[in-house]
Amino acid sequence: LVLRHPEQHIMLMRDKTYAQEMEYISTNKTRNLFISKLVASQEGNTLVLAQYIEKQLVPLCEMIIERCKENREIYLIYGATPTDDREKVRSLVEQNENAVIVASYGTFSTGVNIKRIHNIIFASPYKSQIRVLQSIGRGLRIAGDKEQLNLFDISDDLSYNNRENFTLKHFGSRIEIYNQEEFDYEIIPITLKT
């Protein structure tokens, strides 16, 4: 999913650094609201991965809880979550059909084996081939009730004139990975409203 941001935001972001772009993206309420709606629209166990805990992960989890609390179990996992609690969540999700895990890339891209992940949402842009493939690998585990994995790779189009923004370039790198791995994918442009 390629999110085209409003023109006034693009104008403000056109000369910003990578760090400033990531700050804008991770704290953008409209973007996070879109992600929370996407989570609510999916069936099956959903893993939402984000990079910044305080800036994005926690506020995004709160939005998801507000939207989904009536019919889904929602778990927040990041570096400070004790190993025993992570294992409890893993066990609960294996037994659940419609749970949501909101986690940091660092805690869930490697070393966690949950077979019943039906959807993965990359809520933060990432470029590392190893981390991208390891994150996708969380959902490629075989489970009896799962025929496919839906990956929602959220990218942000803040390009101005002929200049692509940093995170859109990173999306291009992830597309190269998807092509190398021969994944089926579709790029869907979406216009964010203010």
Segment roles from a protein language model:
Residues 47, 65-87:
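Conserved RecA-like helicase motor-core motifs
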Residues 41, 45-46, 183-194:
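Long, largely alpha-helical accessory region at the distal end of helicase-like NTP-driven motors
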Residues 44-45, 72-73, 97-99:
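Short coil/turn segments at beta-strand junctions that form active-site/ligand-binding loops
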Residues 22-28, 76-80, 98:
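Short, flexible loop segments at the rims of nucleotide/cofactor-binding pockets, characterized by
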Residues 2-4, 47-51, 75-79, 101-104:
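Short, conserved beta-strand edge motifs with alternating hydrophobic and charged residues
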Residues 2-4, 8-69:
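Conserved interdomain hinge at the start of the Helicase C-terminal
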Residues 79-180:
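Conserved RecA-like P-loop NTPase helicase motor core
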Residues 1-2, 75, 121, 152, ...:
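Hydrophobic/aromatic beta-strand patches that form the interior of the parallel beta-sheet core
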